[in-house]
Amino acid sequence: MAKEVVEVLVTGGRATAGPPLGPAIGPLGVNVMQVVKEINEKTKDYEGMQVPVKVIVDTETRKFEIEVGIPPTTALIKKELGIETAAHEPRHEVVGNLTLEQVIKIAKMKKDAMLSYTLKNAVKEVLGTCGSMGVTVEGKDPKEVQKEIDAGVYDEYFKEE
């Protein structure tokens, strides 16, 4: 029972039989349109966001299964802000502001895919991404918020750990 795994990054709810998907799975002998339909169904909640998808094909039976990953942190931040692109000069240009609650929401979505053991550290990882995108948090530079988290200013947000 040989299995082939194809990993691609698709736009949520808008996968097509064209590149990168079609050329990657076509030679494996599965119905490409069926795969595309199932991917679009499973990624519709991530509409417009780049989503990592694994297509696992059993090359003998031609059966397939789809595993949908979590979009990159940058995509989740952009969706939360309702913006298309991050800052071109992140240290000089601000493209949006998130509340700490929004950052915590993103960290909870990504926590399983992160290297962090605690929610507090996952939030600090998301804050680092905010800094590289030109996004402020609570109207402040994300590095400042990270220092405040270390100092215990926001401990009430992390009590459930």
Swiss-Prot record:
Family, as annotated: Belongs to the universal ribosomal protein uL11 family.
Protein name: Large ribosomal subunit protein uL11
Function, as annotated: Forms part of the ribosomal stalk which helps the ribosome interact with GTP-bound translation factors.
GO molecular function, one term: large ribosomal subunit rRNA binding
Entry's Gene Ontology BP terms: translation
Keywords for the protein's UniProt record, in alphabetical order: Ribonucleoprotein, Ribosomal protein, RNA-binding, rRNA-binding
Any one annotated GO CC term: large ribosomal subunit
